[in-house]
Amino acid sequence: DKVFEIYPFNTLAEQNRHTLETIFGKTEAINDIAVVNSLTPIRGRGNVEEDPEKYYKEALLDRQFLNYPFILSSHVTFFRTLFGTGKEDIMSFFQLLNSVVVLDEIQSYRNAIWTEIMIFLNSCAGLMNMKIIIMSATLPDLSQLVDGKCNVVKLIRNPEKYTLHPTFANRVICNYELLQEEITLDRLRRHVLENMQLREKSGAKILITFIKKQTAYDFFHRMKEALGEQSEWQLKLLTGDDSIYERESILKPIRENVWKKVILISTQIVEAGVDIDMDIGYKDISKLDSEEQFLGRIARSGIKNGIPGIVYFFNLDQAEKIYRDDYRMEKSLTLGNEEMRTVLKEKRFQTYYEQVMHYLKEMKNRKTSEEGLEYFFSESLKKLDFLKIQKRMELIEEDCWHVDIILCRKLVMEDGTEKDGRKIWEHYKELLSDYQMDYSEKKVKLSECQSDLNLFRYQIKRNIQIPYNEMIGELYCVYDGEQYFQDEKIDREKLEGDHMYFIDL
């Protein structure tokens, strides 16, 4: 009865909402499409002025019960609906009956629970008459992890017809010369500057991706120093530190080709699904499916002017320390192994995933401890221990070491309107303290206010010395947030000087 499109990040749901607007924007169908996540305000139907009470009650009930024909949401929200024990999780669960669910970028799930995911999805599809479509650039065959019958149909019988077609396969050249040497940030900078010099006349869009956030910051400062103030090249930095506003102010001009000469330094947040088309890429190696995702950001529209895109891989930070529990970080499964370079070139990811599945079965699925499958199904699932099931199936493990902080300042939006963080914060406080307002109206208005607050929201490490002005629950607010920005970019050094430290990864 419903269609769910599920993405790894909230921003991708909004991005695809805009894509659907170009298709259905002039029809009534666009009103049936809703984005459901923590960033998007609750949407009502009709005119609020005609009957406010009815408007707000229906809007809240629609959100709580997912009463929309077409829903765009995130992996986290979907898995809470499927396995969560909260009130709203339970209220929306029945909407999965008879639905079509499209799971995009499935390789981004924690592979420690791939087996459990496949077993549950297979069972739910049968019991609830769901059609689940799994999508990914690399598409692991997770049915291999399930003992017994798994009702899986491969929609593309001959994927090589597309992946090996010259238009697709030859659009990007992978270069491994930097993997042959002990790379440093200074050596990488020289290499990038050489490529910039070669493209000085024609221009180019260069994407440089690091695993660690601090490394991205360090390289950004090195490049800024090398370019100087008079350079024609736009130098941008995009990490998990950036707010939604900052992220879009960087990506939109790149998408629309406003900048002909641009260097975007980033962490891996640009890999999965972000709609940008770059000419040259540099990437610190990690998981093989991450490398393929990165290739999808290069020469996205095909070969330009007879020149294919090119990606230089290097090995700087130790990815295995970051992805500690990910079996895909076995050295033999990375680009450090020449066999994996062939797999990447020929798109033979089934060969790669066969080895990953072997590791999963041998290292985890056969365990008899609490981490093993047998223990989980006999002690948690069979005994209907819903809290333990919910905990096991969390896609993102709970992080108790960070807090959210609102850095108030004034932002000019694309349409010319101004958003004042301090005024939005005051409005947020007023709504919370208004005990006379109807519950439905309050929930809807709070969702709208929180959506605006997200423009000023940042995550930092938990620290009792945070120099905040106000605190509501565990949400901190700094009135003069502008002091922590320089050239429209968060000043990490200034923040850390005031004992506010960003999350490292």
Question: Model-found features: residue ranges?
Answer:
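Conserved Walker A/P-loop ATP-binding site and its immediately adjacent core
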Residues: 2-24, 37-40
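Short basic/glycine-enriched coil/helix segment immediately N-terminal to the Walker B
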Residues: 64-68, 85-99, 261
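Post-DEXD/H (motif II) to motif III coupling segment of the RecA-like Helicase ATP-binding lobe
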Residues: 90-100, 107-165
